[in-house]
Amino acid sequence: MYIIESARQRPPKRKYLSSGRKSVFQKLYDLYIEECEKEPEVKKLRRNVNLLEKLVMQETLSCLVVNLYPGNEGYSLMLRGKNGSDSETIRLPYEEGELLEYLDAEELPPILVDLLEKSQVNIFHCGCVIAEIRDYRQSSNMKSPGYQSRHILLRPTMQTLICDVHSITSDNHKWTQEDKLLLESQLILATAEPLCLDPSIAVTCTANRLLYNKQKMNTRPMKRCFKRYSRSSLNRQQDLSHCPPPPQLRLLDFLQKRKERKAGQHYDLKISKAGNCVDMWKRSPCNLAIPSEVDVEKYAKVEKSIKSDDSQPTVWPAHDVKDDYVFECEASTQYQKTKLTILQSLGDPLYYGKIQPCKADEESDSQMSPSHSSTDDHSNWFIIGSKTDAERVVNQYQELVQNEAKCPVKMSHSSSGSASLSQVSPGKETEQTETVSVQSSVLGKGVKHRPPPIKLPSSSGNSSSGNYFSPQQTSSFLKSPTPPPSSKPPTIPRKSSVDLNQVSMLSPAALSPASSSQRHES
């Protein structure tokens, strides 16, 4: 910043050759030095700005006038004749913005070279053209509109120089290739800006600052943003707003309209103080007639009691009967072991079931008496029903375990009590090991006899009335890391009929096959 400020305050003076007149660049530099030497009227302002406007006012240079009109009126070009009158061209729409792009880049448009050469007044200054931009778009008075004016210097490009070479060599004189190259080199030397080869760092800093100030608003993102709000873009949006949206943009159009509709709504919500408002809900009369009578049977729900299977007579056991079925398999290099326990308590004709993961150290627990070997919670037990239902539960659970594990399943059966399930329904055969534990009344200890392995057939469950287990339930039992908490098994006193409310307190009705059969009957 210090170097740039010093260059602004004390610019070096240049030495010009005595022969020839000054170019437009030399005039601008002399004007810059002159303005730097003057004291500004306000200390915070600088005088060495708007040099091109000051040069045009001092020497009354001829300019190319570009008029920018508001709305859809477009823009036009205007040239001054010898008599001082201005001749304006036709107005072009803003959609034809090729000429405006050249003006924005401060380059001489090639399409205007022939037109400017044929003008009555010499408008070229060392190959450059001074353009005056008159912007009528910011004027508020439409009857006598004013304009904002600024000047830009349109410099020649290689394309315009080639056009000049072609126009000069298009006469009847024969031009060789060397003559054309020599003419092109002379045109470049005549129109090029003065070259500064000063090794001072101030030159680099000043050039970078000038380039930054010129290009800071001409970046690609800024141009894209300006083009979005240009007149041509607004006209295109206005035309497309009257057309029906394409099928791909119906949702976007609906959201845009809803957003505009919500933005136009204004709600004047005022919160009154406590005590100043009237609760109209409380003041509204409540005309509710009390019914003279209520049809209870219409709204009452009768729940039937549990009915056991009539195919087999009801057997009241004299002792607790407990059957343990242990399923073992190795699925995906992981050992899995689950246990299905079926229990019939003393004085209760119904069978109850429970499924839990089984660990290796629970084999010793199976040798204990039924009163000590199970201390599970009542919520873990579910009602099965009759003996036929219990056999069906065993078969279905065995199939589900085998389908889940996708490998051979080994089932071992241990029974305690006076009676047990006789056999499993016929079906596919699975290797099973049966272990029977018989209690001795004399010794008071359970003596376990292990007979040789036998093959027990198992049913596929197709003949059963319903499935008691789902594959999701089986996988949850197989993947459970620890067994659930345990307490004493449920017992129901001897009665001729079992009340449904008492049974629901002991086990969940959703897991009960008896409750499922009840739903089928209802």
Curated annotation (Swiss-Prot):
Record keyword Phosphoprotein present: yes
Compositional bias (Pro residues): 481-492
GO molecular function: transcription coregulator activity
Keyword Phosphoprotein among UniProt keywords: yes
Keywords (A to Z) from UniProt: Developmental protein, Gastrulation, Phosphoprotein
A Pfam family that the UniProt record links to this protein: Spt20_SEP
Coiled coil: none
Protein's name in the database: Transcription factor SPT20 homolog
Bias-annotated ranges (Polar residues): 433-442
Species: Pongo abelii
